[in-house]
Amino acid sequence: MANPFVHVELNTTDLGKAKDFYGKLFDWTLEDVPNVGYTMIKVGEGTGGGMMTHPVPGAPSAWLAYVMVDDVPASTAKAKSLGATILKDTTEIPGVGWFSIFTDPTGAALALFKPKM
C-alpha cells in the first residue's frame, strides 16, 4: 500500500464556531452525522473532511491529516518505536474503521486510518 493521505479533519475546541466560520469562508456544505458529534465537510471534488470536538482533552484546535494504513495498531506501534508520542491509541469508529493519533519526534501531529471493508 502506498499509504496515501485520505482525509483532513478539524479537531476544535468550539465546533459551532468552527462550522459557522468555515461554512461562510469557503461555502462548504456541512452535514452533521447524527448522534456522534461529527460534521462532514462536503467539497464536491477533491478530498473532503470533517470537524469534531477535539478528542484529546486540553489540546488546542488544529487541522489533522489522516494517512491510510493496512493495520492501525501495528503502524501505531511502529511510530512509537521510532519516537512518536501516542495521543490517541487505536480507536474504532463503529461502522467506519479505526484510527490513532500521534505526534512525530518533531512535535507534528498525524492520524492513521484503516477503513472497515
Please describe what each predicted stretch is.
Residues 3, 10, 31-32, 76-117:
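Vicinal oxygen chelate
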Residues 61, 65-80, 85:
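Mid-chain, well-packed structural core segment of small domains
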Residues 40, 66, 99-101:
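Conserved hydrophobic/aromatic beta-strand scaffold that supports enzyme active sites
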Residues 1-19, 46-47, 62-67, 113-117:
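N-terminal beta-strand motif that seeds the catalytic metal site of vicinal oxygen chelate
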